[in-house]
Amino acid sequence: MKTKFLYLINSLFVASAITACSDNENQYVPSDNPENNEKPEWYYTGGQLGTAYLTTSNALEQPTEPIEANEEMSQRFKNGEQLFEKMYMNNHSGVRKGLGPAYVRSSCIHCHPGYGHGKRNPAGAFQTTSIGNGCLLVVYNPDTDGYVSWLTGMPQGHATQPFKAPLDESKVIIEWKKYTDEWGNKFPDGESYDLEYPEVTLAADAVYAKNEGVISSLGNYKVLLESTIGIYGTGLLDAISDDDLKAQYAKEEQDGYMQNGLNEAFFKNGEWVKQYSNTKVTDVNPDFSDKGEQHPFRFTYALSRGPLQDAAGANAMWNITNVTRSNRRYHYLDTYFASASGEDKTVYGGSSWVKASANDPEVQAGYQSYIEEVDPDKNHPTWHADDYTDKTQVARAIAAYLTSQELDVEMDDEDFIDFMVWHRGLAVPAARNVDDPDVIKGKELFEQIGCAYCHRPSWTTGDDNFYDPNGFFTKGDSRLPRYPNQTIWPYSDLVQHKLHMENDIRTGWCRTTP
C-alpha cells in the first residue's frame, strides 16, 4: 500500500543569499570538461553555474560554482550557513543575539531540516520546539480569505521572559483524517493508496490578548496548516527574467487549458494586475534611487513576494525570530487595532499583544530587569519608567519599547550579507540515474500525460541584474552571486493554480512548487 499525505501549504520560509566579493569576480565561468558533455542537458538541474554533484544526505546544502570560485564569497557562505543552522538566543550581546520578545521559531533549520521541506506535525498539539517540524499555522477569516488581525501572519507561539506568547500552541490541536477520492483510493491495476488531510482547531483561550480582555471576540476564523518547502536554488529562480515570467502567464492565459484560469488578482488580459514593491519607510534605504520599482510576484505558495532580496527568506530572518537589523528596526506585531484611533493606535501601535503585555501585572513585574539588559545606558529614555511602582508609567514604557521603530540593531549588516550570500548561493543537486531506462521512461511519461504543462521542466535565466526592493543591495550587486544565461530545470511554471484539496490552501490558489 502506498501512502500519500495532502498537506495544506501556503507560505514559506524560503531563504535568500547574499555575499561580498570584488566587482570583477561575481561571475564564474566553468572550464570545459569532456565528462560534462556526456550527460544530457537535464542532468544539470541548476545549469553549469548552479548544479552540485554530491549525492549524500548533504546534497541540498552545497554552494554554487560562483561561491566556490570566490574566496570571500566562500567564507561568507560558511558564515551564512551558521546563521541559518544555529539557534538564536534571548541574550542581548554576543553571536545570534536578540531572539524575541515574541517569536515563531528560534532558528531557520527548525522548519527546513537538510535545507528541504519539513516533516509534518503528528496528531495532537501543535508544537514547534523540535527541529524538523515544517508546519506553520494559517489563521484566517474565511469570509475574506485574509489573515486574522489578532495574530501575526506567521503566528508567534513563543516569547522571552517576562513576556508571554501571543498564542498558546498547546491549545491548537491537529487531527489527521482519512479521505476517499472519486476513484475509491485505487489505481486501475487494483493497487490502493491512502489520502490524509489535517483538521486543525484553535481554542479561543489559546489567544493571550483575548485572555487578558483586550479582545472581546475573535470573530469568524479558520485554521490551516502550511508546509515549508526547500530553499536550495532560489537564486536561480530569481535569475529568470521578468519578461520570460510574463510570457509564461500570457501563454497559459491564451491556452485556456485550466478550468479555473489564472488568478486574476495577479494577471489578466495579458497584463499584470499587480506586482511587488516595498515602499515602507521603515524598510527602504532613504538614499535608494530605484525605490518603488515593481517586479512580478514569484516566491511563496501564495505569491506574496517578488525579488529574492526581499522575499520570504530575507524577511523570515527577521520575522521568525524577531531579530532586528538595519532595515528592520521594529518588532513583528499583530495589527488588531490598525484601524483604531486613540491610545490603541498611538500608544499600543495598533497591536493587541502590545496592549495585553503592557498591562499584564506579571509582565510589568519583570520588565525593569529585562529592559535594563536591553538598554543598560538608557539611550532610549521612553523605554524606562521613572517610577516602577506606577503601573501606568510601566505600561507606557513597555508599549514604547515594543512599538519602537528605532530598536537597536541585533543582526549587523555583515551578518545579513553573509546570510544572503549563503541563501542566494545554494546549488541544486544534479539529476540522478539519468542513464537508467526506467528514469528515462518516467521522464517521457511525465511529459506525455501533461504534467510538464504546470511543472515546466526548464527555463533559461536572463542577465540576472537582480533588484533589492529595500535598497540594501544595488542592482546586480557584486557582493552576491549571479547566474546569467543558465538553462535550469526547476519543473515549475511559477504560476498559481487551484488544487481543490480538502481543507484547501488559503485563497485556493497555490504556486507550482519548484
Model-inferred region functions:
Residues 1-19:
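Sec-dependent bacterial lipoprotein signal peptides
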Residues 418-432:
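His/Cys-centered metal/cofactor-coordination and adjacent catalytic loops
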